[in-house]
Amino acid sequence: MSAPIPIAAGKHAVEDFVASLNPNQLVYFLCNVGDGDSQLLLLPVDPQGRRRILIVDVCTTKKVPALVDSLQQAGLIGAAAPGAGGEPDGSVALVVATHPHSDHIGGMNELLTKLKPRIGEFWDPGYYHTTQDYLDMMAAIEANPHIIYAQPTAGYKRWFGSALVTVLSPSVGLRNKFDTYGTEVNDSSLSLRIEFPAARAVKRDAGRNLVDKKATMSLILGADAQTLSWAHVLTDFPQLGPNSSDANRAIRAATGTDLLSAKVLKVSHHASKHGVNLELVERISPALTLVSTASPSGFGFPHNVAQELIREALQATASTPGMVHKPDSELGIFYTCDSEDGGGPLGSMAVVMGAGKATVWRFGDTVSQKITLANGRRWTG
């Protein structure tokens, strides 16, 4: 394990986080929950004039439900308004349990119970587990007939307004081995790519080109997918080689040159040595690389070898004798367990994405504290 080096004081500006937001931005929250994952995405305003949220994993109780309450109090989402028959209002458009390890679903039962009037859909990979957290989670889902329940695999796409969620893993090949336990539970993970604004057919010109491709941004949420699963992803989502054919130009116009490129990467498996490889990070080529882990971690995360390969993918030094990597923060690598030099924790982070730009905010919370939006500080680098 290599604990993150404290970030120099003075690298964050105290500003009004809520006032800085505009309705057309996507906001990704990565919560400081120690060894685990809890994530929330605030979507851009939809044609009906409302903002919805997506929740991906809930490691602990309290933190994510409290964040939902804070977003409502700040006027960023509306109050729950279920239908007369108990149908949810869909303001929580989707909840994802990426896989059934407790450090990803330990707070899921509480969340499903508290936010029942809001939740429209629920996804998990369909990997049966015997832990009480998993059984409690599934009991909550099965007791709510109004929630749409799905077990998607690689290639599945779902639009939420202007945001497109693509499932990268598990592959169908891995999914078909679940029932025999021929797939390790981490490799059952639902890893996701979220793109916005994602163009549909009417968002193209006469030549089928995206009207404003430069404004499109993506983030990849790696869950706990390991190298076996990523090997399937690298095959299922190929990089386009140079080709001047009309078909190739049409594909490039629609998707870009790489189906795995992303502005933001939430590193899989807490930056373990099994969670990422060099080719994967080079393919994604993120401007921001985020890691959810504790300090100290009970599992020894992040692993040194994973940190080094991420740094090498972002700043190649292997062929230059004597060259050393820049500090992680200068490479856009941030950890939920980051601290400030001579100060306290930097804590949970939000990445505000829009108009081709991504801005990082920190909230200074510990693992046991809720996120206070008024404490937001913007990373200035």
Language model features with spans:
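Flexible, acidic/histidine-containing loops and adjacent segments that form or flank the divalent-metal
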Residues: 1-28, 33-34, 44-47, 73-94, ...
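Catalytic metal-binding/acid-base residues of hydrolase active sites
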Residues: 34, 59-61, 101, 128, ...
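Alpha-helical scaffolding within the catalytic cores
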Residues: 35-39, 66-67, 106, 246-251, ...
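Short hydrophobic-acidic sequence motifs that mark active-site Asp/Glu residues
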Residues: 40, 53-55, 191, 218-220, ...
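Active-site metal-binding motif and surrounding structural segment of the metallo-beta-lactamase
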Residues: 44-54, 59-124, 252-272, 285-289
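Acidic/histidine-rich helix-loop elements
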Residues: 58-69, 176-180, 236-246, 269-273, ...
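Short, charged, surface-exposed secondary-structure boundary motifs
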Residues: 65-67, 130-136, 298-303
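Long, structured stretches of catalytic cores involved in phosphate-ester chemistry, encompassing
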Residues: 249-348
